[in-house]
């Protein structure tokens, strides 16, 4: 799952969907390090020690709390502290209860997918495309398991910041026919 949040479409979609400001991307929410993704994909049987080496670039059992690795969209530093947690740093602060719930549910889905993943892959994928962003993110959410009526509100909130259509990858395919029908109706009525 970590490889799915590579500097590719999924990471870009997540950052755009949750509304991460460009000013945060420069310091507090840097994109995932390519070398980390490549190292973790090469590691066929990961252990805590090998994951630590993959994350820090070398085995670091005692790290400085505020080191450079901490300021990534995905922060694994707390795994080696007493917390044993993962931190998603791509969210902006909000007090809207529905947005907070949607963001929390999204994090749970990401964590569940990562936990259940049998393997990881760093293969190149289709690049981020503004025209199909909403559609691509909807498909990503459905693959995470966010399908059905109980996730409808979450999908709506997370896709609100993305351009494009959630139903059509390249925009509506029936537009020419709809335009022709509208012109025909206008000619008859006008």
Protein language model features and the residues they cover:
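C-terminal accessory/tail domains of diverse enzymes
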Residues: 1-190
